[in-house]
């Protein structure tokens, strides 16, 4: 997908909650708590972000858990649940954070400066307005992210203590 560039200019898609909604929502058959229990003892992790021109899953692991890490990322890629509870938590906590950020000159500039520099394009604001938070819907976010991920190109980057052969094999087994 094209990340921020896929979003409408009015900022109506709650991209601010994407990382939390996607990873903390767990998988289709496993909540985050259940997933953590299943993976206890393994060193794997996952993150999700909306970049300016991409959506990105990321993870950090150790060599002995590399294959499991790839399986986890592939599972999020194909079956992220985006449950409503993490989305509700970020919606309830973000207005207070906005007040704190806006209380400083640098914070106010960050919140309002980027949209002004981009002709009012709210996609480039680092955080939403309170009104956007209030009207944000998880289903809207999910629709845009799912479409972008399912129709966009996939780029996989692996860095660390893993051979090229092991990386190719793990990608082939998980992402195809």
Regions found by a protein language model. Give the residues of each.
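M16 family metallopeptidases and their MPP-like homologs
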Residues: 1-23, 27-79, 90-99, 104-135, ...
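A common structural junction motif
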Residues: 75-82, 174-176
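An aromatic/glycine/proline-enriched structural segment found at the starts
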Residues: 155-176
């Amino acid at each position: 997908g094209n990340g921020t560039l896929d979003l409408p200019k009015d900022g109506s898609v709650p991209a601010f909650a994407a990382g939390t909604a996607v990873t903390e929502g767990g998988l289709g058959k496993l909540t985050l708590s259940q997933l953590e229990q299943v993976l206890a003892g393994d060193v794997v992790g996952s993150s999700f972000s909306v970049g300016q021109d991409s959506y990105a899953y990321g993870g950090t692991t150790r060599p002995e858990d590399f294959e499991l890490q790839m399986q986890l990322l592939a599972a999020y890629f194909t079956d992220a649940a985006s449950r409503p509870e993490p989305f509700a938590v970020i919606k309830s906590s973000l207005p207070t954070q906005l007040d704190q950020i806006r209380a400083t000159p640098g914070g106010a500039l960050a919140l309002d400066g980027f949209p002004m520099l981009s002709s009012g394009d709210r996609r480039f604001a680092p955080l939403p307005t309170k009104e956007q938070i209030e009207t944000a819907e998880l289903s809207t976010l999910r629709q845009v992210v799912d479409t972008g991920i399912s129709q966009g190109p996939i780029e996989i980057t692996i860095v660390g203590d893993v051979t090229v052969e092991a990386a190719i094999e793990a990608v082939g087994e998980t992402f195809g």
